Amino acid sequence: SGVTDETVFFKYLNGNSWGNDETVSDPVCGGAGGFASDRFLDVPDVDTVLDPVCFSECIGCNESYVHFAVDADGYEITDGMRVAGSFNAWDANVDFMMDAGEGIYKMAKAFEEGTTIEWKYVLNGTTWEELGEDVCTTGGGYINRTTTVTDDDMMFDPVPCFGSCYECGGAPL
Protein backbone atom coordinates (compact mmCIF):
# COMPACT_ATOMS: atom_id res chain seq x y z
CA SER A 1 0.00 0.00 0.00
CA GLY A 2 2.98 2.31 0.31
CA VAL A 3 2.26 3.09 3.97
CA THR A 4 5.25 2.26 6.17
CA ASP A 5 6.60 3.17 9.57
CA GLU A 6 3.28 4.36 10.91
CA THR A 7 0.39 2.92 12.86
CA VAL A 8 -2.88 2.14 11.12
CA PHE A 9 -6.17 1.49 12.89
CA PHE A 10 -8.73 -0.99 11.55
CA LYS A 11 -11.47 -3.46 12.48
CA TYR A 12 -13.31 -6.33 10.90
CA LEU A 13 -17.01 -6.24 10.05
CA ASN A 14 -19.40 -9.18 10.19
CA GLY A 15 -21.55 -8.18 7.25
CA ASN A 16 -21.36 -4.98 5.29
CA SER A 17 -22.31 -2.22 7.72
CA TRP A 18 -21.25 -0.55 10.94
CA GLY A 19 -23.05 -2.02 13.90
CA ASN A 20 -21.73 -5.41 12.88
CA ASP A 21 -18.16 -4.39 13.67
CA GLU A 22 -16.00 -6.03 16.27
CA THR A 23 -14.90 -4.51 19.57
CA VAL A 24 -11.32 -5.36 20.48
CA SER A 25 -10.30 -4.25 23.97
CA ASP A 26 -7.24 -6.51 24.36
CA PRO A 27 -4.20 -4.19 24.41
CA VAL A 28 -2.11 -6.82 22.62
CA CYS A 29 -3.70 -5.92 19.28
CA GLY A 30 -6.55 -3.54 20.03
CA GLY A 31 -8.01 -0.98 22.38
CA ALA A 32 -7.00 1.80 20.03
CA GLY A 33 -8.67 4.45 17.92
CA GLY A 34 -11.36 6.98 18.72
CA PHE A 35 -13.59 4.51 20.56
CA ALA A 36 -10.75 2.43 22.05
CA SER A 37 -12.05 -0.65 20.24
CA ASP A 38 -10.02 -0.67 17.02
CA ARG A 39 -7.19 -2.98 16.10
CA PHE A 40 -3.83 -1.41 15.37
CA LEU A 41 -0.84 -2.37 13.29
CA ASP A 42 2.59 -0.76 13.28
CA VAL A 43 3.25 -1.08 9.56
CA PRO A 44 6.71 -2.49 8.77
CA ASP A 45 8.65 -1.63 5.62
CA VAL A 46 8.27 -5.16 4.20
CA ASP A 47 5.23 -7.04 2.89
CA THR A 48 3.32 -8.48 5.84
CA VAL A 49 0.67 -11.18 6.14
CA LEU A 50 -1.35 -11.04 9.35
CA ASP A 51 -2.09 -14.25 11.23
CA PRO A 52 -5.77 -15.28 11.27
CA VAL A 53 -7.60 -14.18 14.41
CA CYS A 54 -11.01 -14.82 15.90
CA PHE A 55 -13.58 -11.99 15.58
CA SER A 56 -13.07 -9.50 18.47
CA GLU A 57 -9.97 -11.40 19.67
CA CYS A 58 -6.22 -10.98 19.26
CA ILE A 59 -5.65 -14.72 19.02
CA GLY A 60 -6.89 -17.60 16.88
CA CYS A 61 -10.26 -19.19 17.58
CA ASN A 62 -8.58 -22.40 18.79
CA GLU A 63 -6.31 -20.57 21.25
CA SER A 64 -6.62 -19.35 24.83
CA TYR A 65 -4.46 -17.12 26.96
CA VAL A 66 -2.55 -18.49 29.92
CA HIS A 67 -2.02 -15.66 32.40
CA PHE A 68 1.23 -16.48 34.19
CA ALA A 69 1.71 -14.88 37.60
CA VAL A 70 4.19 -15.31 40.42
CA ASP A 71 4.72 -13.65 43.80
CA ALA A 72 8.40 -12.84 44.33
CA ASP A 73 7.91 -10.47 47.26
CA GLY A 74 11.00 -10.55 49.45
CA TYR A 75 13.39 -11.49 46.63
CA GLU A 76 15.92 -8.99 45.31
CA ILE A 77 15.00 -8.46 41.68
CA THR A 78 17.61 -6.58 39.68
CA ASP A 79 17.02 -7.98 36.19
CA GLY A 80 13.34 -8.91 36.11
CA MET A 81 11.29 -12.08 36.22
CA ARG A 82 10.95 -14.40 33.23
CA VAL A 83 9.07 -17.54 32.21
CA ALA A 84 11.00 -20.37 30.58
CA GLY A 85 9.32 -23.53 29.39
CA SER A 86 8.49 -26.11 26.79
CA PHE A 87 6.97 -23.35 24.63
CA ASN A 88 10.16 -21.26 24.27
CA ALA A 89 12.87 -23.96 24.30
CA TRP A 90 13.49 -23.26 28.01
CA ASP A 91 15.09 -19.92 27.10
CA ALA A 92 15.02 -17.51 30.05
CA ASN A 93 15.66 -14.54 27.76
CA VAL A 94 12.47 -14.71 25.66
CA ASP A 95 9.38 -14.19 27.83
CA PHE A 96 9.78 -11.31 30.28
CA MET A 97 7.10 -10.70 32.89
CA MET A 98 5.69 -7.28 33.84
CA ASP A 99 6.07 -5.92 37.36
CA ALA A 100 2.50 -5.57 38.65
CA GLY A 101 3.66 -4.15 42.01
CA GLU A 102 4.01 -5.59 45.51
CA GLY A 103 6.35 -8.34 44.28
CA ILE A 104 3.83 -9.75 41.76
CA TYR A 105 4.96 -10.42 38.17
CA LYS A 106 2.55 -11.23 35.32
CA MET A 107 2.53 -12.18 31.65
CA ALA A 108 -0.09 -13.52 29.23
CA LYS A 109 0.70 -15.85 26.33
CA ALA A 110 -1.60 -17.58 23.84
CA PHE A 111 -1.50 -21.35 23.34
CA GLU A 112 -3.50 -23.78 21.25
CA GLU A 113 -6.27 -25.36 23.34
CA GLY A 114 -5.44 -28.87 24.54
CA THR A 115 -1.70 -28.19 24.63
CA THR A 116 0.12 -29.32 27.77
CA ILE A 117 2.84 -26.88 28.77
CA GLU A 118 5.62 -27.01 31.34
CA TRP A 119 7.48 -24.02 32.75
CA LYS A 120 9.49 -22.47 35.55
CA TYR A 121 9.83 -18.90 36.71
CA VAL A 122 13.35 -17.47 36.45
CA LEU A 123 14.52 -14.66 38.72
CA ASN A 124 17.02 -12.14 37.29
CA GLY A 125 17.56 -14.34 34.24
CA THR A 126 19.70 -16.89 36.09
CA THR A 127 17.93 -18.10 39.26
CA TRP A 128 15.54 -20.88 38.28
CA GLU A 129 12.93 -21.78 40.86
CA GLU A 130 13.31 -25.17 42.52
CA LEU A 131 10.07 -27.06 42.98
CA GLY A 132 9.29 -30.29 44.77
CA GLU A 133 6.77 -32.83 43.50
CA ASP A 134 3.40 -31.27 44.25
CA VAL A 135 -0.06 -30.52 42.89
CA CYS A 136 1.16 -28.06 40.23
CA THR A 137 4.22 -29.97 39.01
CA THR A 138 5.36 -32.85 36.87
CA GLY A 139 7.06 -35.83 38.45
CA GLY A 140 10.22 -37.56 37.40
CA GLY A 141 13.74 -36.27 36.93
CA TYR A 142 12.80 -32.69 36.11
CA ILE A 143 10.13 -31.08 38.23
CA ASN A 144 8.36 -28.26 36.40
CA ARG A 145 5.06 -26.45 36.69
CA THR A 146 2.51 -27.91 34.28
CA THR A 147 -1.00 -27.30 32.97
CA THR A 148 -3.15 -28.25 29.99
CA VAL A 149 -4.64 -25.28 28.15
CA THR A 150 -8.45 -25.23 28.19
CA ASP A 151 -10.92 -23.37 25.99
CA ASP A 152 -11.17 -20.53 28.52
CA ASP A 153 -8.46 -18.04 29.38
CA MET A 154 -6.53 -19.44 32.34
CA MET A 155 -5.45 -17.37 35.34
CA PHE A 156 -3.49 -18.48 38.36
CA ASP A 157 -5.42 -17.03 41.27
CA PRO A 158 -4.39 -16.77 43.98
CA VAL A 159 -0.89 -16.05 42.72
CA PRO A 160 1.66 -18.72 43.73
CA CYS A 161 4.91 -17.92 45.51
CA PHE A 162 8.20 -18.22 43.62
CA GLY A 163 9.41 -21.81 44.15
CA SER A 164 6.05 -23.05 45.45
CA CYS A 165 2.67 -24.33 44.25
CA TYR A 166 1.01 -22.30 46.99
CA GLU A 167 0.09 -18.73 47.71
CA CYS A 168 2.77 -17.16 49.90
CA GLY A 169 1.98 -18.36 53.42
CA GLY A 170 -1.14 -20.14 52.20
CA ALA A 171 -2.64 -23.55 51.57
CA PRO A 172 -2.30 -25.49 48.31
CA LEU A 173 -3.79 -23.83 45.23
Short names for language-model regions:
Residues 33-75, 143-173:
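Primarily marks secretory-pathway-exposed extracellular/lumenal segments that are disulfide-
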Residues 1-7, 15-41, 72-114, 123-148, ...:
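Aromatic-rich carbohydrate-binding modules that target alpha-glucans
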